[in-house]
Regions:
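Alpha-amylase-like alpha-glycosidases and glucanotransferases acting on alpha-linked glucans and related
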Residues: 1-5, 12, 18, 56-199, ...
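Catalytic domains of carbohydrate-active enzymes, especially glycoside hydrolases
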Residues: 2, 27-52, 295-297, 442
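N-terminal catalytic cores of NTP/NDP-binding nucleotidyl/phosphoryl-transfer enzymes
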Residues: 8, 12-31
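Short alpha-helical segments and helix-capping/turn motifs at coil-helix boundaries
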Residues: 27-34, 204-212, 286-288, 434-438
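Surface-exposed amphipathic alpha-helices with a cationic face
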Residues: 37, 206-214, 339, 363-364
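Outer-envelope exported proteins of Gram-negative bacteria
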Residues: 47, 219-221, 225, 299, ...
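Conserved, well-ordered alpha-helix/loop/beta-strand core segments that scaffold catalytic motifs
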Residues: 195-228
Length: 505
């Protein structure tokens, strides 16, 4: 795909302002769509919206299909008669409005959501004899039948076992013995349905938000990681999809080889795909996954695109990534299968880092736009990440969720020589401001699409950084201050957007 010249803003759902501990799909999200429209933006990029677990990373979700219950808007549940304000308004969701307190959310949010479910049970319609799904509750379950039952069962079993990794469950449940699963379903039917209810509410609220964004001329760019988490419904219920043994334990796991930045490489621990199985089944699971993603997003960014060309496979049990080896991925065969099944693929490829020539060839053959990041540019050489070198078919960023804010980066991460190079390159002045000058450079580039993180428009310090790779705790927490998302800021963004011919018509 190729974009017409345009721009957008990266703003995670979790970072939206609001009163209940984390951003949501209700008024905070709708207000942000209004802000984008006033600012002349046509794309809202978000991070993955799956349920989060250990370390709160949206890239390590327990499902490739489910939505995060934390994003369900409580006021919308109240408007539907499933809650009252007193059920949640007085709860302390964390003492710092600028950061998500995931521990507090975990302790308190589900109790409120269970109240909503209890009220839902009182209102739930009984299906008629003539049709299996006379309303949207049954319709949602029917349309989600490829993944919802396994996800809800996984979550119910996980909760019954103290939320431990599924590899630590009783063996009969771990290996999915039919009798054990049937017995659990019979004894925990209500708990299983609770998890279905959460996905139903997520779906209702998300589709309302998506429709509102379309009405305002704003497309939503979603994001999915290439791999699923080891502790996920996908790995538990679909072990044939991965390189696993009879017990479902990975034989090899994902990561990155040693490099200049990490002498031992990066050991991610995700189960690797059994690409031979996917090939034999016509990539059916991938078609299902991408079809689902494109049903909720207008554009899809896929993380770690290089893994479709070659991927680093590390024997399970290794403590570092040193002893891995490169293996061949599915390359264009996968994308041809996706195209044949789904038609045009509005995909953006995350192609950052060192790349083999074969990865560049795959990107070119796919036609997907890659990414360029300003913060990688100032090496003292004529870097491909300097704006004058951007190809048209790419997405330009000052930084991604894995980078510091521009303010933090310029102040702390550049040498004196690099800082001088940046000042000279952009002709930065005190009058314009350092950050505004660099954003000007990204917007002025020839890249068809420019995406600016909201934290950079707000000129936030390093405290607003979303993620520091390699840091286990303290990530994914930043939240924007609603008072800073002003009409004046929207007007300023629109002026710059129009100046560089990126504004919505």
């Amino acid at each position: 795909m190729e974009f017409k010249r345009c721009s957008g803003i990266l703003m995670p759902i979790s970072s939206l302002p609001g009163g209940y501990g984390i951003g949501s799909m209700g008024k905070p999200a709708h207000d942000f769509v209004d802000f984008l429209a006033k600012a002349g933006q046509t794309i809202w990029q978000i991070l993955p919206v799956g349920p989060t677990g250990y370390a709160d990373s949206p890239y390590q979700s327990c499902s490739a299909f489910a939505g995060n219950p934390y994003f369900i808007d409580l006021d919308m549940l109240a408007a539907d008669g499933l809650l009252t304000k007193k059920d949640y308004a007085a709860i302390n969701w964390g003492g710092d409005a600028a950061h998500v307190d995931y521990g507090t959310l975990y302790e308190k949010r589900f109790a409120v959501l269970r109240k909503a479910y209890a009220n839902f049970l009182k209102k739930r319609p009984v299906p008629g004899y003539e049709t299996p799904y006379p309303d949207d509750w049954y319709r949602f379950q029917f349309l989600s039948s490829d993944w919802l039952p396994d996800y809800c069962l996984y979550m119910a079993i996980k909760e019954a076992n103290g939320m431990v990794d599924w590899q630590q469950w009783p063996r009969a449940l771990r290996v999915r013995e039919p009798e054990a699963l049937a017995e659990f379903k019979a004894e925990h039917a209500g708990e299983i349905e609770f998890w279905a209810f959460l996905q139903y509410e997520f779906d209702r609220q998300w589709r309302a938000l998506h429709a509102y964004a379309k009405e305002k001329g704003v497309a939503i760019m979603g994001d999915i990681p290439i791999y699923v988490a080891a502790d996920s419904a996908d790995a538990w219920a679909g072990r044939e999809l991965f390189e696993t043994d009879a017990e479902g334990k990975p034989r090899r796991v994902a990561g990155c080889p040693p490099d200049y930045f990490a002498a031992d490489g990066q050991l991610w621990g995700n189960p690797l795909y059994d690409w031979d199985y996917h090939r034999r089944t016509g990539y059916a699971w991938w078609i299902l996954r991408i079809r689902h993603a494109l049903s909720i997003y207008d554009i899809l960014r896929i993380d770690h695109f290089r893994g479709f060309d070659t991927y680093w496979a590390i024997p399970a049990g290794e403590t570092t990534a040193r002893n891995g080896r490169w293996e061949q991925g599915p390359r264009m065969e996968l994308f041809r299968a996706l195209h044949n099944a789904l038609g045009s693929l509005p995909i953006v490829a995350e192609d950052l880092g060192e790349m083999f020539d074969s990865v560049r060839e795959l990107l070119a053959e796919s036609g997907f736009p890659g990414m360029k990041v300003l913060q990688f540019a100032f090496t003292g050489e004529d870097s491909v990440d300097l704006p004058h070198n951007y190809p048209r078919n790419c997405v330009a960023y000052p930084g991604t969720h894995d980078n510091n804010t521009l303010t933090g980066w310029f102040a702390k991460e550049l040498t004196a020589a690099q800082r001088k190079q940046a000042v000279d390159y952009f002709a930065l002045t005190k009058q314009e401001g350092t950050v505004r000058g660099m954003l000007r450079g990204v917007l002025a580039s020839t890249a068809a699409l420019a995406i600016i993180p909201m934290a950079d428009w707000l000129e936030e310090t390093a405290a607003a950084r979303m993620n520091t790779p390699g840091q286990a705790q303290g990530n994914w927490q930043w939240r924007a201050d609603a008072k800073k998302l002003t009409p004046a800021l929207a007007a300023e963004i629109r002026v710059l957007t129009e100046r560089y011919f990126r504004a919505a018509k």
